[in-house]
């Protein structure tokens, strides 16, 4: 579970800093929803890691909820981009279907989130250890 704890910080950084670095702060004027979703996800993961580090009783549930939010938040972007590539059709001009690297990156992020969710749920009955 310690690996998941540290991955929580890494993925929070990916959601918070990665989204801004990839799109720029000006993307808020294009699609604020996707930016806010990623920022909320990063903040939720940071909060869950903080609660876990303090050893609060709610920590396992908070960690599971944060990873579930992250997994759900990554499913649609990954699946939509993959579908666009499979259909050979760009659905949104800011997401060209030929951008295979973006599909792979989204798939890796989704896989990490899902793996951390599964580990967290399997570990959910145990009290958090101070990391």
Predicted regions, residues:
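Topology signature of small-to-medium multi-pass alpha-helical membrane proteins
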Residues: 1-131
């Amino acid at each position: 579970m310690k690996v998941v704890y540290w991955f929580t910080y890494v993925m929070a950084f990916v959601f918070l800093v990665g989204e801004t670095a990839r799109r720029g702060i000006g993307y808020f004027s294009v699609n604020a929803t996707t930016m806010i979703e990623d920022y909320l996800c990063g903040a939720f993961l940071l909060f869950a890691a903080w609660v876990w580090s303090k050893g609060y009783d709610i920590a396992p549930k908070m960690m599971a909820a944060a990873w579930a939010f992250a997994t759900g938040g990554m499913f649609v972007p990954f699946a939509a981009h993959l579908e666009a590539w499979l259909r050979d059709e760009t659905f949104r001009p800011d997401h060209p279907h030929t951008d295979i690297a973006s599909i792979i990156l989204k798939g890796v992020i989704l896989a990490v989130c899902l793996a951390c969710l599964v580990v967290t749920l399997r570990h959910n009955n145990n009290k958090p250890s101070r990391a």
